[in-house]
Amino acid sequence: MLMPKEDRNKIHQYLFQEGVVVAKKDFNQAKHEEIDTKNLYVIKALQSLTSKGYVKTQFSWQYYYYTLTEEGVEYLREYLNLPEHIVPGTYIQERNPTQRPQRRY
């Protein structure tokens, strides 16, 4: 499907930043909830990435759930010209320091 390159870049940047995209199965929806572009563009761009094996698709209750694969991370890193140390949000683990309770003697 033909779509403006800046819309495709927005979709790819969001996918790489978050690691996942949720899209409602509504092809007539004027705008995607999180990405500033048409919902149809989001669905079709991610279907294209799914057919290439860069994204896994899960469909449930009228929503598409797209998850980035390892090959997809490499592809988007090359497509967006990003360095190796930048990773999607799903790869980052927050470290919460656990504190032990203080002993009373």
From Swiss-Prot:
It comes from Saccharomyces cerevisiae (strain ATCC 204508 / S288c) (Baker's yeast). InterPro entries: Plectin_eS10_N, Ribosomal_eS10, WH-like_DNA-bd_sf, WH_DNA-bd_sf. It comes from the Eukaryota. Component of the ribosome, a large ribonucleoprotein complex responsible for the synthesis of proteins in the cell. The small ribosomal subunit (SSU) binds messenger RNAs (mRNAs) and translates the encoded message by selecting cognate aminoacyl-transfer RNA (tRNA) molecules. The large subunit (LSU) contains the ribosomal catalytic site termed the peptidyl transferase center (PTC), which catalyzes the formation of peptide bonds, thereby polymerizing the amino acids delivered by tRNAs into a polypeptide chain. GO terms for cellular component: cytosol; cytosolic small ribosomal subunit. Present with 54100 molecules/cell in log phase SD medium. The gene is RPS10A. It holds the Pfam family S10_plectin. Keywords: Cytoplasm, Ribonucleoprotein, Ribosomal protein. Disulfide bonds: none annotated. The keyword Ribosomal protein applies. The keyword Membrane does not apply. The N-terminus is not modified. Transmembrane segments: none annotated. It is found in: Cytoplasm. PANTHER family: 40S RIBOSOMAL PROTEIN S10 (PTHR12146), RIBOSOMAL PROTEIN S10 (PTHR12146:SF0). Signal peptide: none annotated. Belongs to the eukaryotic ribosomal protein eS10 family. Component of the small ribosomal subunit (SSU). Mature yeast ribosomes consist of a small (40S) and a large (60S) subunit. The 40S small subunit contains 1 molecule of ribosomal RNA (18S rRNA) and 33 different proteins (encoded by 57 genes). The large 60S subunit contains 3 rRNA molecules (25S, 5.8S and 5S rRNA) and 46 different proteins (encoded by 81 genes). eS10 interacts with GCN1 (via middle region); this interaction is direct and promotes GCN2 kinase activity. This is Small ribosomal subunit protein eS10A. One of its GO terms (molecular function) is structural constituent of ribosome. One of its GO terms (biological process) is cytoplasmic translation.
